[in-house]
């Protein structure tokens, strides 16, 4: 779901899930780093009265209010960039979905942030799976995702967060999983 099927046999279906290491995150982390460091250096240049930037001279700016504003934007941009780089280094959200008929178990595994929830692992019985549910919302912020409906639990998301997968890919993955588990596909 969001990744390729790693192992598929008549007994085991394993699907890798892409986490935070996506091109869009690398792109925005790079842009935020450049912008944040640039604003930070511009603010510090106005404070020290010494040019710390290569591309322009910001020593002529008054520290209050322009330099303070530049420092604020620099700290904010660098914080966002740091968060993005950290999530990519930890590969938050990555993992796998494994459906094992031999052991009769469904294992949903994801990596989280450090702490007690670093390893997120949900294990259910295949017999408890009621259906595979496809959720499709179009509009400004489209959402296309697959969920596993399990008895006495809320729906478990199977697809990665972020960019929605194509409709045909969603249909194919949902149908493949429903066929493998022998349950209905809902929502299409």
From Swiss-Prot:
It is found in: Cellular thylakoid membrane. GO terms for biological process: photosynthesis. The chain crosses the membrane at residues 26-48, 63-85. Belongs to the Ycf4 family. Keywords: Membrane, Photosynthesis, Thylakoid, Transmembrane, Transmembrane helix. HAMAP family: Ycf4. It is a multi-pass membrane protein. It comes from Synechocystis sp. (strain ATCC 27184 / PCC 6803 / Kazusa). Seems to be required for the assembly of the photosystem I complex. This is Photosystem I assembly protein Ycf4. Its main location: membrane. It holds the Pfam family Ycf4. GO terms for cellular component: photosystem I; plasma membrane-derived thylakoid membrane. The keyword Thylakoid applies. The keyword Thylakoid applies. NCBIfam families: PRK02542.1.
């Amino acid at each position: 779901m969001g990744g390729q099927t790693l192992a598929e046999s008549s007994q085991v279906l394993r699907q890798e899930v892409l986490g935070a290491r996506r091109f869009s995150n690398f792109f925005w982390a790079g842009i935020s780093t450049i912008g944040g460091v640039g604003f930070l250096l511009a603010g510090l240049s106005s404070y020290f009265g010494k040019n710390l930037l290569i591309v322009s001279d910001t020593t002529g700016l008054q520290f209050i209010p322009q330099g303070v504003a530049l420092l604020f934007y620099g700290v904010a941009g660098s914080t966002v960039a740091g968060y993005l780089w950290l999530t990519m280094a930890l590969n938050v959200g990555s993992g796998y979905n494994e459906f094992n008929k031999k052991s009769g178990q469904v294992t949903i595994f994801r990596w989280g942030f450090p702490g007690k929830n670093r390893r997120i692992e949900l294990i259910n019985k295949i017999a408890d799976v009621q259906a595979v549910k496809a959720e499709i919302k179009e509009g400004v912020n489209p959402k296309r995702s697959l969920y596993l409906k399990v008895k006495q639990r809320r729906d478990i998301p199977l697809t990665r967060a972020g960019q929605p997968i194509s409709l045909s890919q969603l249909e194919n993955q949902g149908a493949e999983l429903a066929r493998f588990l022998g349950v209905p596909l809902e929502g299409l």
